[in-house]
A protein has these predicted regions:
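Short, intrinsically disordered, mixed-charge
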Residues: 14-17, 64-68, 111
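Glycine-rich, often acidic-flanked micro-motifs
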Residues: 2-12, 83-96, 111-211
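Long, basic/Gly/Ser/Thr-rich N-terminal segments
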Residues: 1-60, 73
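Short, acidic/polar N-cap/turn motifs at the starts of alpha helices
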Residues: 39, 80-84
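N-terminal pre-Walker A segment at the start of P-loop NTPase domains
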Residues: 58-79
Length: 211
């Protein structure tokens, strides 16, 4: 990713991640962002992808284009909307709808001794899972639940949604954790339901009902 605009360059930090991974590179692409009179232009390998974007939205759109192409290349994988972590060597997934608190939970688990690999997306193939290396998208209104990151959160890349609320792109490695992406089998699956402000309860659930 490259750009001719210093403001856009700062926004690219929202996308760039630094997770350790040892998978072969199957393809390389060059994305460019140029500032124009009518907004920002995104190019992929020299060809236009999208134009007329403002500074607040282009990072989201660029990430959408990048991830879309990645999913085409690794089409043999099944995507699961899930966080991924390990405890004492046992890998588990945290599945749930958008807004239930997966990212907040996965970030908090980092500070509770868990190895956390992703907050949003996991790829599955041949019985093994590969966490998708994307920065954790922490909503500004959940920061009161994550006091550990408050001292440095203002230095973390962020974008603003349509309502002006900030969404921070958090990297575990920037907080001193080992952010590692590797394929492993899953031992447990947790399905998270919204219960904001209520008591946390863990219940056993048969696989067919969870599906």
């Amino acid at each position: 990713m490259r750009t001719d605009c210093k403001h856009a360059f700062r926004q690219l930090g929202f996308i760039a991640q630094d997770a350790r991974q040892d998978f072969p590179i199957s393809k390389e692409l060059v994305y460019e962002v140029f500032r124009q009179d009518m907004g920002y232009l995104i190019l992929k390998d020299g060809l236009p992808c999208e134009t007329g974007l403002d500074l607040k939205s282009f990072a989201y759109r660029l990430q959408w284009h990048i991830h879309g192409h990645v999913f085409e290349v690794i089409g043999e994988y099944t995507r699961v909307h899930s966080g991924c972590a390990e405890h004492h060597g046992n890998r588990f997934l945290v599945v749930g709808d958008s807004g239930v608190g997966k990212t907040t939970l996965m970030t908090r688990l980092l500070y509770e001794g868990f190895r956390v690999h992703s907050d949003e997306l996991v790829m599955i193939r041949h019985g093994k899972t590969v966490p998708f290396p994307r920065r954790f998208h922490i909503k500004g209104d959940s920061l009161h639940l994550l006091p550990q990151i408050r001292p440095f959160i203002d230095s973390v890349p962020f974008v603003e949604n349509g309502g002006g609320a900030k969404i921070f792109a958090f990297s575990p490695s920037e907080a001193g954790f080992d952010w590692l992406i590797e394929d492993r089998e899953v031992k447990l699956v947790f399905f998270v339901e919204s219960n904001h402000g209520g008591q946390t309860v863990v219940e056993k659930c048969p696989k067919y009902l969870m599906v």
